From Swiss-Prot:
Keywords: Amino-acid biosynthesis, Branched-chain amino acid biosynthesis, Isoleucine biosynthesis, Transferase. One of its GO terms (biological process) is isoleucine biosynthetic process. Belongs to the alpha-IPM synthase/homocitrate synthase family. InterPro entries: 2-isopropylmalate_synth_dimer (IPR013709), AIPM/Hcit_synth_CS (IPR002034), Aldolase_TIM (IPR013785), Citramalate_synthase_CimA (IPR024890), LEU1_arch (IPR011830), LeuA/HCS_post-cat (IPR054691), LeuA_allosteric_dom_sf (IPR036230), PYR_CT (IPR000891). It comes from Methanosarcina acetivorans (strain ATCC 35395 / DSM 2834 / JCM 12185 / C2A). Residues 1-245 form the Pyruvate carboxyltransferase domain. This is Putative (R)-citramalate synthase CimA. HAMAP family: CimA (MF_01028).
Length: 483
C-alpha cells in the first residue's frame, strides 16, 4: 500500500487505507505495508488504525535504518517493519553521505534494536541491482546475525532483466540463511517479468501493488504476478483470485488513478472483443481468443460493437440482452450498427438495444423514469442536487452533493435507485462536443458496472447535466433489466 500511495497525486486518508487494507485482507494477502510511520502524525494514526482493524494479514511499516523510525513504527502497533538500507555506492555516498562499513554497522544495530522490541524485521537492500554483490551479501549476513527474519532485494530504478534476476536469486537463495523477497520497479516495463523470474529462482515473497501503482512507472502488479503464477506456472498462491477485479476497481476509485484500458487482466479492454472473426471464434470455444476465463478474477467478458463487428457479435450481444432475432432482423440490425460505426460513432450497449428494439418492434417501459431534478451550484455553495424518480411505479425523492453539479446529480440518482441497483459503480465518464459554440450538443458516455458486469450508455443534449442524467439513467435501466 505504501508504494502504491507514492504514485504522484495519490494521498490516502485513514478511511481509504482501511477500505483498501480490508479488501487486501479478504484476498488473503500475507503482508500489508500500510505506510511509513515517520511521515507524519496523521500517517501514524492511519497505520495504527489498519494495525488494530483485526485483519489476518501481517501489518508492516516502512523504516529507514534510523532508530527513531522504529520507535514511530512501534507507536503504530505494527507486526513488522520493512527496514531499508541503501546498498549501492551511489546511494551510500550521495544520499546519506556515509561509507559501506558504517551502513553495515547501522543496519545491523537497527535490526537488533527492532528485534529487541518484538518486531518482525525484513531487511531490504535499496538499489541492490547496482550494488557490489559481495557487499550486498555481507550486509544481508550481518542482518541475519542481528535477527532479521526476511531479506529483500530492491530493483529501485527497474534495471534488472529476467535472465540477470534468475542468476542473482539462485545465488542469494542458496547462499543466505533467510528467505528473500523481490521488490521491482517498472521503469522499463519488466517489473512483473523480473518478479516472476525471482520467484521461480528461489525468492519466497514478492512486493507488489494493485494495478501496478507506484512512483514513476510504478511497481510490479499484484494481479499480473498472481495470475502468472497461478495460470502459467500452475502454482497455488492462496490468493482469492475471484476478488482481483473488484479490488482493482476499488483501488482505482479511491486513488483517483484510472486503469489503462489495455492494462493486463484488469484493463477495460482485457476481456473485450469487437472484431467479428474473434467473436465467432469465442462462440465456438472461449479459449480461442482468451488465455483464461474472466470469471476467474471476478469479471465478465464484454462484446463491443463498431465498424469491425460481425454478425456473431450482434447475435451474442442480443442473446445477452435476452432478445431473439431471425436472420433477416439480425441482418438489418447488423447493417444499422455498421452504418453507425462507419460514421465514427461509439456504439454503446444502450445504442444496440435501441436499434434492436426498433427493428424487432419492441417497446420496453423503463424501470427507472426521471420525473424532475433541481441543481443548486455556485462559487460559495456546495453543489447539491435533488431528484424525483419513478422506480418500479414508486415515487422516490432523493438528494446528493458532489464536487460539481454533475457529480451531485449522479450521486442523487445512485441514492434513489439503491434499493434495486445496489453496488452499481460509475467506472468511466466521458464528454464529447458534437457541435461547436456555447450551445453545442454534447454527448456523455458512461461505463457502469455491477457484480463484474460492465455496460456502456450515452446521452446527448445541449445541457451537459441533462445529458449526464440521461446517460446514467439509460445505463441503470439496462443493468436492472438484465439482473
Amino acid at each position: 500500500m505504501r508504494d502504491g500511495e507514492q504514485t504522484p497525486g495519490v494521498a490516502l486518508t485513514r478511511e481509504k487505507k482501511l477500505l483498501i487494507a480490508r479488501a487486501l485482507d479478504e484476498m488473503r494477502i500475507n503482508v500489508i505495508e500500510a505506510g511509513s510511520a515517520i511521515t507524519s502524525a496523521g500517517e501514524r494514526e492511519s497505520i495504527k488504525a489498519v494495525a488494530n482493524a483485526g485483519l489476518d494479514a501481517e501489518i508492516c511499516s516502512y523504516c529507514r535504518i534510523v532508530k527513531m523510525d522504529v520507535d514511530h513504527a512501534l507507536e503504530c502497533d505494527v507486526d513488522s517493519i520493512h527496514l531499508v538500507a541503501p546498498v549501492s555506492d551511489l546511494h551510500i555516498k550521495t544520499k546519506i553521505k556515509k561509507d559501506r562499513d558504517t551502513v553495515r554497522q547501522i543496519a545491523a544495530e537497527v535490526t537488533e534494536y527492532a528485534k529487541d522490541h518484538g518486531l518482525i524485521v525484513e531487511l531490504s537492500g535499496e538499489d541492490a541491482s547496482r550494488a557490489d554483490p559481495e557487499f550486498l551479501k555481507a550486509i544481508y549476513s550481518d542482518g541475519i546475525d542481528a535477527g532479521a527474519d526476511r531479506l529483500c532485494f530492491c530493483d529501485t530504478v527497474g534495471l534488472l532483466v529476467p535472465e540477470k534476476t534468475t542468476e542473482i536469486f539462485r545465488d542469494l537463495s542458496s547462499s543466505l540463511k533467510a528467505p528473500i523477497s523481490i521488490h521491482c520497479h517498472n521503469d522499463f516495463g519488466l517489473a512483473t517479468a523480473n518478479t516472476v523470474a525471482a520467484l521461480a529462482a528461489g525468492a519466497k515473497q514478492s512486493h507488489v501493488t494493485i494495478n501496478g501503482l507506484g512512483e514513476r512507472a510504478g511497481n510490479a502488479s499484484l494481479e499480473e504476478v498472481v495470475m502468472s503464477l497461478e495460470w502459467l506456472y500452475k502454482y497455488d498462491t492462496g490468493i482469492k483470485h475471484e476478488q482481483i477485479y473488484r479490488t482493482s476497481r476499488l483501488v482505482s476509485r479511491l486513488t483517483g488513478i484510472p486503469v489503462s484500458p489495455n492494462k493486463a487482466l484488469v484493463g477495460g479492454n482485457a476481456f473485450t472483443h469487437e472484431a467479428g472473426i474473434h467473436v465467432h471464434g469465442l462462440l465456438a470455444d472461449k479459449s480461442t481468443y482468451e488465455p483464461m476465463s474472466p470469471e476467474y478474477i471476478g469479471r465478465q467478458r464484454q462484446i463491443v460493437l463498431g465498424k469491425h463487428a460481425g454478425r456473431s457479435s450482434i447475435t451474442l450481444a442480443l442473446k445477452e440482452m435476452g432478445l431473439e432475432a431471425d436472420e433477416a432482423q439480425t441482418e438489418e440490425i447488423f447493417n444499422r450498427v455498421k452504418q453507425m460505426g462507419d460514421q465514427g460513432k461509439h456504439i454503446t450497449d444502450a445504442d444496440l438495444q435501441t436499434i434492436a428494439e426498433t427493428v424487432l418492434d419492441i417497446y420496453k417501459e423503463p424501470i427507472v423514469k426521471l420525473e424532475e431534478f433541481t441543481i443548486v451550484s455556485g462559487n460559495r455553495v456546495t453543489p447539491t442536487a435533488s431528484i424525483k424518480l419513478n422506480v418500479k411505479d414508486k415515487e422516490i425523492v432523493q438528494a446528493g452533493i458532489g464536487n460539481g453539479p454533475v457529480d451531485a446529480v449522479i450521486n442523487a440518482i445512485r441514492r434513489a435507485v439503491s434499493s434495486c441497483a445496489e453496488d452499481v459503480v460509475l467506472e468511466e465518464y466521458h464528454v464529447d462536443s458534437i457541435t461547436g459554440g456555447t450551445d453545442a450538443l454534447v454527448e456523455v458516455r458512461v461505463k457502469l458496472s455491477k457484480n463484474g458486469k460492465v455496460i456502456t450508455a450515452s446521452g446527448a443534449r445541449t445541457d451537459i447535466i441533462m445529458a449526464s442524467v440521461e446517460a446514467v439513467m439509460n445505463g441503470m435501466n439496462r443493468l436492472i433489466r438484465e439482473e
